[in-house]
Amino acid sequence: MLTPPTTTAAITCNEPDPRLHADMRDAVYTTFPASEPYRHIEEGPENAVAHLATAMLFGESTWAPVRNGRLDLGTWQHVYLVELYEPRTRQVDVAVLGE
């Protein structure tokens, strides 16, 4: 399992196409417009959007199979961190289960 110990970023597995990333970003802000009257606004509406998108669209972690010490992903699968708030250095925790 891969997970960032935060609630404003997510780990996901998807195609590494920059156009898809732009579509995902647009979907976040279409679903959760920053102009909405959010109640969690201490750090600005973008922070509320990040929390909502992590919880309701992405989830904050993903599982990835490991075989012979390497990620065993499909041709179009790539694991990446989705930054939903402010760019910053992030930690990603890894948990390994099994043999």
List PLM regions with ranges.
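Active-site histidine-anchored catalytic micro-motif
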Residues: 1-99
